[in-house]
């Protein structure tokens, strides 16, 4: 009886204590957005197919995936795409479909690593924010900044950075990227060395298949 009281007392004490333990979140360490030159949106599409799709084609996909979007007029979607900084309806809806999938899969953290550009990061963050009202009780996907740099030796380097280092990465990309498809004339070793020396986290992508 005394032992039971001690156990009960210990249990009650643990219940009232503040939980200082960590929490696990589902995380995507490497994801591309419509900003990547080879983005395809759906698994069954390739890049060329996606490029040929019209605003209306992507709208039909969105209707099947995002709750309530079929209630919106296409004119309203077009207006929103411009209002929130997207290039067109197709891009706006593509980001919305991606953000919607992150909510459905209960992804807590995601590292955006588009090829040779960081322009897609803010667009994905905005789409996640805009869909919050549809999933008020779901885990909110936190976006980490990243970029996948295509190097001269055909290897790819992923660089992960916080908002304070955005300007550093932007300047490097501006000065060293030939174009978003070709990447940089620098070797992977030079890229790794530069960003590592600056205190940024970086690693070789697809190293087991390169």
Where are the regions a protein language model picked out?
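Extended substrate/RNA-proximal surfaces in nucleic-acid metabolism proteins
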Residues: 2-17, 24, 121-210
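Histidine-centered catalytic micro-motifs
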Residues: 26-38, 115
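Short, conserved beta-strand segments within well-ordered enzyme catalytic domains
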Residues: 28, 110-111, 144
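Acidic/histidine-rich helix-loop elements
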Residues: 33-91
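Hydrophobic positions within alpha-helical membrane elements
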Residues: 35-37, 119, 153
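Short, acidic/polar
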Residues: 43-45, 87-103, 210
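Divalent metal-binding segments
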Residues: 80-82, 90, 116, 176-185
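Divalent metal-dependent hydrolysis catalytic cores, especially in the metallo-beta-lactamase
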Residues: 99-116, 201-203
């Amino acid at each position: 009886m005394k032992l039971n009281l001690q156990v009960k007392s210990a249990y009650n004490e643990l219940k009232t204590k503040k939980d200082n333990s960590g929490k696990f979140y589902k995380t995507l360490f490497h994801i591309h957005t419509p900003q990547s030159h080879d983005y395809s949106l759906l698994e069954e599409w390739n890049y060329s197919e996606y490029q040929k799709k019209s605003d209306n084609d992507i709208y039909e996909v969105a209707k099947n995936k995002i709750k309530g979007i079929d209630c919106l007029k296409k004119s309203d979607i077009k207006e929103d795409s411009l209002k929130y900084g997207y290039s067109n309806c197709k891009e706006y809806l593509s980001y919305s479909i991606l953000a919607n999938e992150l909510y459905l899969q209960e992804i807590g953290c995601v590292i955006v690593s588009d090829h040779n550009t960081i322009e897609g990061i803010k667009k994905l963050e905005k789409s996640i924010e805009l869909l919050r009202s549809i999933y008020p009780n779901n885990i909110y996907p936190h976006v980490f900044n990243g970029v996948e740099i295509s190097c001269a030796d055909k290897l790819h380097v992923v660089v992960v950075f916080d908002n304070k280092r955005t300007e550093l990465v932007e300047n490097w990309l501006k000065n060293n990227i030939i174009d978003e498809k070709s990447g940089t004339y620098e070797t992977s070793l030079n890229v790794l060395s530069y960003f590592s020396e600056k205190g940024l986290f970086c690693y070789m992508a697809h190293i087991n298949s390169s």
